[in-house]
């Protein structure tokens, strides 16, 4: 039965999300994305106390910080992100058109924004097989991962197909990992 209240594109997006468990979409609110990028760039410059060019600072961040200093940087940045009254608004604006389409408009956003930074050859920051539900989060939440740079080759995140995810979940739940 056709739903008279949603467009065909919304229906396709919802069906893809239900089938695959995720969607990858192009950002529509570039202004909010740029605001977030500029926030990070300003923080990096202040934290490192260097007058760096904005042009490639995010793409070359791995050349600016040592792996041993990354966690302190990340924790300080998370603190600043969550102190800023405009950050959550801009973060939500980036994702809201798609969230509204896949889960509806009755949304709740977590109080704190989190952050993962992974540098080349940094084994300490890797997110192995990751699912928020394994750490006690609701299986009914939608998580937004927002890359701040163009992602390609090894500069990207791999998402398991649903069938493989189910196999790995069973493995983690088995006694082999307890």
Residue ranges and their predicted role:
Residues 1-102, 106:
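N-terminal auxiliary "cap/dimerization" subdomain that precedes the catalytic jelly-roll/cupin core
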Residues 3-4, 40, 104-109, 113-117, ...:
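Generic preference for hydrophobic/aromatic residues in regular secondary structure cores
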Residues 11-16, 22, 111, 127-129, ...:
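Broad hydrophobic/π-residue packing in well-ordered secondary structure
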Residues 17-18, 103, 108-110, 122, ...:
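A generic structural signal for short, non-catalytic loop/turn and secondary-structure boundary residues
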Residues 24-27, 107-112, 143-147, 156-159:
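A structural signal for short, well-ordered beta-strand segments and their strand-loop junctions
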Residues 27-28, 113, 118-120, 132, ...:
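Structured loops at beta-to-helix junctions and adjacent beta-edge loops in soluble globular domains
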Residues 88-131:
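Hydrophobic alpha-helical segments and helix pairs
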Residues 125-178:
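Catalytic core of non-heme Fe(II) oxygenases with the double-stranded beta-helix
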């Amino acid at each position: 039965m056709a739903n008279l209240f949603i467009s065909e594109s919304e229906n396709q997006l919802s069906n893809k999300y239900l089938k695959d468990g995720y969607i990858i979409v192009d950002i529509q609110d570039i202004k909010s994305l740029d605001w977030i990028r500029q926030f990070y760039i300003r923080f990096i410059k202040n934290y490192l106390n260097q007058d760096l060019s904005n042009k490639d600072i995010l793409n070359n961040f791995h050349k600016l910080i040592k792996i041993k200093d990354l966690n302190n940087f990340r924790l300080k940045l998370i603190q600043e992100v969550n102190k800023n009254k405009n950050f959550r608004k801009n973060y939500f604006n980036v994702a809201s058109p798609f969230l509204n389409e896949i889960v509806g408009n009755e949304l709740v956003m977590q109080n704190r924004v989190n952050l993962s930074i992974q540098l080349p050859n940094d084994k300490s920051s890797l997110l192995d097989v990751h699912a928020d539900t394994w750490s006690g989060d609701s299986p009914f939440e939608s998580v937004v991962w927002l890359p701040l740079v163009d992602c390609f080759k090894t500069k990207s995140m791999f998402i398991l197909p649903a069938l493989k995810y189910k196999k790995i979940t069973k493995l983690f739940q088995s006694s082999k990992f307890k």
